[in-house]
Amino acid sequence: MRLLAWLLPGLLLARALAPAQAPWPVRFVDVAARAGLTRPSVYGGLEKKRFIIETNGAGAAFFDADGDGWTDALVLNGTRLEEGARRELVWPKGDAPVSHFYRNNRDGTFRDVTAQAGFGKTGFASSVCVGDYDNDGALDLFVTYFGRNVLYRNLGGGRFEDVTAKAGLAAPRDRWGSGCSFVDYDRDGRLDLFVANYLAFDLAQAQEPGQGTNCLWKGVPVNCGPKGLPTDTNLLYRQRADGTFEDVSEASGVARVTGRYPMTAAAADLDGDGWTDIYVASDSTAAILYRNNHDGTFTDVALPSGVAYDEDGRAQAGMGLGLADFDGDGRLDLLKTHFADDIPALYRSLGRGQFEDVATSAGLGVLNRYVEWGAGMPDLDNDGRADVFYATGNVYPEIEKHFAQYPHRGPKVVFRNMDGARFEDVSARSGPGALAPHSSRGVAFGDYDNDGDVDALVMNMNEPPSLLRNEYAGGNGWLELKLAGTRSNRAGLGATVVVSVAGRRQARAVLSQTSYYSHDDLRLHFGLGANAKADQIEVRWPSGQVDVLKDVAGRRVVTIREGESGSTR
């Protein structure tokens, strides 16, 4: 008692002197049901997953399909295996799960127009990448599958046609497509296409849970892989002038990178040389950084660049990716998410294509019991600093019965960027939408309700998606930029935009794929803090052109056309 009396004044004094917890003005609310996003994404077994094809899940996309200035939504779907069998379930007519396309009604709600839009394929979908491959002003889609991938051409008004065979992209055999990105790697103004293949999987020959050394997790029998399963090679297709594609995987050097289990693929200029590179998160193996050699070929430089492994030199189970400038130096940094018992990687750009993993020193190492998936670095509170958001969900539904600390359904994890160097875990203060447990996979970020803050669309396994509306309560300004290429591809994919506000810089890239197997709205969102305008906007186009705009007023969407800024260098 005497000891308590002696300690109490000191404890009270320390508490009084401790800095007050800064208010966090971001609150996520899941409005999916009332917004009309109600169809579940069927993906493998519910209580147990026998094979790895049931576990990885799929992505989602925020994109303006009909050009009306409002973001539409696509949520990919999977299927199930027949009970006790090694084949996909044959569904009754009309019941087969398909990917769902929702048109934005411009009032906070969406309408399911899947059938009218032309989506009817059933199967284990993986990822989606978006780009205007024919430069007609309407955004097209490429969707990867366990089986055969599909190129959807936008016919206008958000109606799509399967043109895979017509475009020369019909595969000669089934493969397990994973990440993809449209990318103009040769600077001819036409989008080419990168496609990753996760691994070579033969359902007929696959081992049952627990049958091999790679079929146990912490002693519990689980589905096997990816370790121990044969790898595959990645693909690069070059677009010809007639709108068809040719396979240049071998000639470009892309197929020479082997022994990986590639997942999400993001295409951006990561070394600042004006040519688009491709970064690929890889499961249980070293990540890949395809450096563009400016001559139609690529070289994997992930190891010398510092983005192959974690800060201790270990391979990680790379799932999702986020690209943004978290430290405000005008260079693109990388966020990569991983498996349970690990933490995300945060690769800080040192310039000239060199990076260092600062995840631990930045404060991202405080959580490690979740499997991390869709990720991004959106500026959630519009203060001009890139925050961190990622979804979670275990791949083994049965593990929770043995280890409660590894939940099958997890929360969304939110870190606030404090000062460009350190992050604070604000998940518990980010509203019911962030805390609600789901086994989530892909996340797409965008301002679907056009209210000036970043919302999130989340693919949930065997549940409807979550539509997390950001009920931002602060007064910070913002600016959204939409690019329109002329010499470059029409959508501006691969461009880097650097916005300068009150002495601080923010860099973002226009990406075909990011997060986990997903696509963010192409309008780049920048927080302005207490400022009313951006002092300068610099656009580095994939053609090599650089446009500069001065004194751009905020709280609006601005379209920037290549070469029309009035200031070009």
Give the ranges of each region predicted by the language model.
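Blade-edge beta-strand/turn elements of extracellular beta-propeller
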Residues: 28-30, 109-119, 159-170, 243-255, ...
